[in-house]
C-alpha cells in the first residue's frame, strides 16, 4: 500500500518512524529556511539529521494574581498556591462562584489540560517512561483537584443541571488561553492556564493585566521548564512517490510566505518572520481589537473590557521569551490518554496512586515495546 508523501505527526511519536527509516531527513531542506535556533535544535538528532519540524509553535502561559503567579515555578508549587486559597472557593453569593481553575470540576479535562505542559518530563533519555514523574504528576493533579472539590460539591448541589455528566467539556489544546482570561476579571478562577498561539492571544493576556493591575502573566512551567507547544509537526515519508514535490511543499511551509499564511494558529518558526514586524503588526499600540463583557462576581456589575494592541516593549518581551523555549511538550496521544484515563480513576477515588501509576506504566510499556 502507498501512504501519503507528507505526514502530519501531531499526536504521534515520530521516534519509531524515524528508527525504522520511514522518514526522510529534512536537514538539507531546512538549512535554507533559517529557523529559530531553539526550535531547530529541539528536533535535531546528534548526527545532525532532522525527521520532523513543527510549522508553528505556542507558548504556555499562566495569568493570575501577581504574587501567586510569581510563586508558581512548577506543578507542585501550582498545587501549593491553589491549596492555599482553598477557603475562597465555592459559592461566594447566590449566583457567584470561585474555582481554582476553569476545568477544576472535570477530572478528564483538568488532567488533559495539566498533562499538556508537564508531559515533556515523563520520558527518560532512553525513551522509556519515568514512573516517578508520572506518579508526581498524578499526585499533584489530585491535590489541585481536591483544592476545589468542596467548592464543586457545593456548586453541583446548587446547580445540578449544570453538571450533567453528558455535558463534560472537551479539552482542546488549540483553544488558547484567551477565552479563559476574562474569568480573572470576574474573579471566578484563581488562574487562567493555557497557551498562546497568536498576537491576538497575547493581546488578551496583556490587556487583562493592564485593566486589572493586580494581575500578572508569566511563562507557565510545569514538571519541565521552558517548554513550547509544537503545531503541525511535518515529516516526509521516505517512500514518497513524488519526493521532489513533497520537498517543494515543505520548503514552502517554511518560507516567509508560507509562515505568513495565517497568524492565528501559532508563532512562526522561521527567524526572519518571527523577528520581523509584519507578523506581529495589529495596528497602533493601544488600538482596541476586541471588546467583551463579563459580570463581576464581587459586586454583580457587568464588566466591559477592551482588548488592546500591546506596546512594542511588551511584544519584544514576548518574542524574547519565545526564543528561550527549548523543549517540545510530549505530543503523544497514546501516552497522555493512558495517564489521563488512569488519572481520572485515581481522582475519583476508584484506585490508589500506586495502582494508577502502575496501570499507566503497564499500558504504555506495552505500547513502547511494540
Regions found by a protein language model. Give the residues of each.
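A ligand-binding cleft/hinge motif common to bilobed small-molecule-binding domains
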Residues: 12-18, 194-212
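C-terminal capping/gating helix-and-loop segments adjacent to ligand/active sites or protein-protein/ligand interfaces
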Residues: 290-368
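Extracytoplasmic/periplasmic solute-binding protein
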Residues: 51-55, 60, 79-142, 146, ...
Amino acid at each position: 500500500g502507498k501512504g501519503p508523501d507528507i505526514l502530519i505527526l501531531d499526536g504521534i511519536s515520530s521516534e519509531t518512524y524515524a528508527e525504522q527509516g520511514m522518514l526522510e531527513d529534512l536537514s538539507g531542506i531546512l538549512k535554507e529556511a533559517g529557523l529559530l535556533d531553539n526550535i531547530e535544535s529541539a528536533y535535531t538528532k546528534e548526527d545532525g539529521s532532522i525527521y520532523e519540524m513543527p510549522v508553528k509553535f505556542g507558548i504556555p502561559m499562566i495569568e493570575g494574581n501577581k504574587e501567586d503567579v510569581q510563586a508558581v515555578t512548577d506543578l507542585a508549587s501550582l498545587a501549593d498556591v491553589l491549596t492555599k486559597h482553598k477557603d475562597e472557593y465555592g459559592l461566594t453569593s447566590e449566583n457567584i462562584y470561585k474555582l481554582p481553575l476553569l476545568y477544576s470540576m472535570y477530572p478528564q479535562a483538568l488532567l488533559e489540560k495539566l498533562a499538556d505542559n508537564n508531559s515533556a518530563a515523563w520520558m527518560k533519555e532512553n525513551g522509556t517512561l519515568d514512573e516517578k514523574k508520572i506518579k508526581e504528576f498524578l499526585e499533584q493533579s489530585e491535590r489541585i483537584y481536591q483544592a476545589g472539590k468542596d467548592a464543586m460539591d457545593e456548586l453541583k448541589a446548587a446547580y445540578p443541571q449544570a453538571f450533567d455528566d453528558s455535558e463534560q467539556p472537551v479539552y482542546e489544546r488549540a483553544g488558547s488561553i484567551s477565552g479563559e482570561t476574562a474569568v480573572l476579571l470576574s474573579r471566578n478562577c484563581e488562574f487562567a492556564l493555557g497557551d498562546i498561539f497568536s498576537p491576538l492571544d497575547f493581546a488578551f493576556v496583556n490587556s487583562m493585566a493592564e485593566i486589572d493591575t493586580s494581575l500578572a502573566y508569566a511563562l507557565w512551567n510545569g514538571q519541565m521548564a521552558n517548554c513550547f507547544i509544537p503545531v503541525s509537526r511535518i515529516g516526509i515519508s521516505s517512500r514518497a512517490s513524488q519526493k521532489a514535490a513533497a520537498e517543494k511543499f515543505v520548503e514552502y511551509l517554511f518560507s516567509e510566505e508560507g509562515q505568513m499564511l495565517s497568524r492565528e494558529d501559532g508563532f512562526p518558526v522561521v527567524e526572519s518572520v518571527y523577528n520581523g514586524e509584519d507578523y506581529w503588526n495589529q495596528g497602533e499600540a493601544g488600538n482596541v481589537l476586541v471588546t467583551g463583557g463579563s459580570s463581576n462576581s464581587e459586586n454583580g456589575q457587568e464588566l466591559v473590557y477592551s482588548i488592546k494592541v500591546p506596546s512594542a516593549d511588551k511584544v519584544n518581551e514576548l518574542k524574547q521569551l519565545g526564543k528561550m523555549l527549548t523543549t517540545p511538550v510530549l505530543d503523544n496521544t497514546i501516552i497522555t490518554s493512558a495517564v489521563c484515563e488512569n488519572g481520572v480513576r485515581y481522582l475519583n477515588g476508584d484506585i490508589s496512586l500506586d495502582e494508577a501509576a502502575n496501570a499507566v506504566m503497564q499500558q504504555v510499556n506495552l505500547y513502547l515495546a511494540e
